[in-house]
Amino acid sequence: MNKRYIVICILFFGVALGIYFYRNSSTSSIVPVVTSENSPWTLIATGDIIPARSVNYKTITYKDFTWAWKNIASILESGDITVINLESPLLSNCPITNDGFIFCGDKRHIEGLVYAGVDVATLANNHIGNYGKKGIDETVKFLRSRGIDVTGIDEEPAIRVVNKIRAGFLAYNDIGAKEEGVSWADTSVMEREIQELRNKVDVLVVSMSWGEEYTATPSARQKELAHFIIDSGADFILGNHPHWIQPVEVYQGKYIVYAHGNTIFDQMWSEETKKGVIGKYTFSGMRLINVEFIPTYIEDYGQPKVLEQF
């Protein structure tokens, strides 16, 4: 099948992101958000949120679990639905360390999420299981106790309602090894779950942990999965994991954001790992009508600030 490939660069808030257009011939609790029926509604999404290692250490040292969120909370709170990729379990007894690749954060980081107005946490990634199923279960308990929905765990969707529009969220991990309880990017399972949720919601969003770390271009595997997800019935894809910003593709009229970069993490060792974008996606009913990317830049090993441009 022949495809015409068009590359368009557009500037949102001074952030140049490539947008690729392809022309092709071819239950958790439901929480209502009160707004008027015909008004637009906004979905806000972040890059990787990892309240572990130095982020955890500094937060505890500063005795302020809202510290990492101070400069971005007003943006996140402004969304009707705000979704994050939480790439670290939250534990009652998390060891304090500045290094290593076994991630966890103190359970009190939940205060930061609440402060920033987080509604949905996607947990399907390669670090949420660093403390096993027990750590996952503890994290889910803490999140739900504060009214934050979760998805990407035990093949369970999250559903939120705004303007009488039902927005459904699924999440899958395509990195590392399969872990108990974490939703894996098995295409047969994904297709079934997307089609099942499709019948229950008006807007269907899939969050993906995928791709190669520290790369600015989506891999062939990412593109293959992305097109499969859209063809299976999803409306929108939110990607993360590479820790760099990656471009956007519009496929069959649907947006695929391959990676938002880092939002809260301690990777201070390169310019690219300090950068991220907060996506502000405005819908009218079921239709996406505006896309904005707000650039962020991490300072002090974990606190992002908002930039006018990179």
Identify the residue ranges that each predicted region occupies.
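Short, Lys/Arg-rich N-terminal segment immediately upstream of the first membrane anchor
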Residues: 1-2
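Acidic, metal/ion-coordinating pockets
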Residues: 5-310
